[in-house]
Amino acid sequence: MTNCYSYKNIAESQNPLFKNVDLTIVLTMKDSVRFKKDPLLLNLSKKTIFQINKGYKACKKPDTIKRTVEDLTHAYYTAFEYSKKYNNVIILEDDAEVLNYEVSHYKKIDSYIGSNDFTIISMGSLGFFTKRDEMFYETHPMAHTQAQIISKKTRDDIQKLMLNKKFMGHVDAVYFSEQNVLVYHEPLIVQVLSETENFQNWEGAPLWAHRLTISIQGLRDDKMGWYKAYLICKSSAEIREYKLNILSLIVFLLFLYCKK
């Protein structure tokens, strides 16, 4: 299986944005040209490398890997194995694009991970948000994994889970969603969704429903749609946070009405 992957050093930095991240791994496919070598992406950590995947069709992998979904899960597993000697690691998928270039956001996250325990910090994910504080939202489940900071312990834990599940299932929904993911309050590094083979295998709803959802959110063909998508996620979080107060107010008003 090790023959299915190769590695290439693409950048080193003496002054990275994240002082508390040891390595950035960009997951890509052989002959892919999707990754945009944005200077910010190449300066996230001290070292940035490609993990180049030949793919399950061209290289023998475990028998359960029969779709791009499982192939991507296996690629994450392999990246975690490669990074065993490192502490905090950033994993980028090769369609990751920078949305927000304001350096202060990245510095805030770096300061946080330098003084706090964490599992996964996302720089661009969606889901059912719950506000944690002014800096982060929690989300369960989560969707989209194109830019994640993952602690060493969490990578080890997810590897075990991937082995137990034989690499079956989506990385975000099956493996990351159970890890108390923190999502930064602004989308920083995002992806533009297109009709890839992996998209064709999205689960949880019919394909037409996924297409409709990302169209409503504005995530197709324009990365600026992520601001709208975050607003939707944040608004739903506010509704859930205050729903008990709203319900109590309704009950109180009904009580007053019935007393008349």
Predicted regions mapped to residue ranges:
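An acidic/histidine-cluster motif and surrounding catalytic segment
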Residues: T2-L92, A96-K260
